[in-house]
Amino acid sequence: AAGADIMTTNTFGANRLKYDKDGELKAIVEAAVANARKAADEAGRGYIALDLGPTGKLLKPLGDLPFEAAVSLYKEVVSIGAAAGADLVLIETMSDSYELKAAVLAAKEAGIDPKTGERLPIFATVIYDEKGKLLTGGDVPAVIAMLEGLRVDALGINCGMGPEQMLPVVEELIRYASVPVI
């Protein structure tokens, strides 16, 4: 049947930096997971991906957000999303390998299925430029090595350029990755 097998939650920008009123972040994440689950249930199939995007702040030393604070921001969202019933964590549109690492560590620590006690699968995608570099300079092999070292379940590229410009980067991802490329 046509359609999507993975539904993403509408939580790309949801974090304590943007939603700091009492209970606001929790309500947003829970509603997003519930809405995605409803769509999957209506379709009769589908997994729910808790969608995590960049915090909107640069991490130190390039910016003012400490690494530990970034981990904490992501852990809060992942904890709420996992408790609400997300099936996996999708970290996407990352341009800083340090922030990407913070998000993955948070997902590993807080992304526990409350029913099974198992870690939720983690997918991670980044934004490369046409030279295969992140905003902060990391290249394809370095990002793959980091993500595979952190034991993500799948990795890939999204946004930033069109399909023709992405093709050489995707080919490099496929050449070096030992986990599924998304």
Residue positions per predicted region:
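Domain-level signal for soluble alpha/beta catalytic cores
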Residues: A1-I182
